Amino acid sequence: AGGHTIQDDEPKYGLCVTGFVNPASMWKNIGAETGDVLILTKPLGTGILSTAVKGEMASEEETAYAASVMATLNRYARDKVVDLQVHACTDVTGFGLAGHALEMAKGSGKTLCISLGSLPIMKGALDSASMGFIPAGAYRNREFAGGECEFSWKNHSGESSENFWLEKTRCEAVENETGRSETIINEAELAAREDIVFDPQTSGGLL
């Protein structure tokens, strides 16, 4: 269940979908447990790319790619994990990854650790963010959630008063287990990735 909060000058139309669900089969945005792995099913950046499109600064390829991602149903991701034990799930939409992850963390009484370097990001979104194509909703999301997110250069020690911990490097434990090489990210890209964390998503994925 969900909805949209819209504040702009463009006309919109709305739809309503109703149905039935078995309460025992519902996934809620609370209930995350210590040791759970976070899976993000779609790349981030729709709000930033949409802003770039309105500014006529996005390429045809970037525009088509963003549209294809938004048109992809979450049903396919759901079907891949429906037989697994999912403790918590949320969509990533208007409040951005930060807002929805924070809601999950608070509701579960846990701290979520997310590596900025590991986040999937749409083609062109980093460049568009670096050029300043940040939607107004991203600033509101940062104002709402930014004070409860902690950005750190170091790996999370497991002890934090924050609900949401964002690392500026990949999680060391993940690197050691998978054998993947370290990703080096410069300051400009880090700033753009921080903006994308707060970017409001249209037809975003699941977390």
What are these language model-derived features?
Residues A1-L207:
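Helix-biased detector of long, well-ordered alpha-helical tracts
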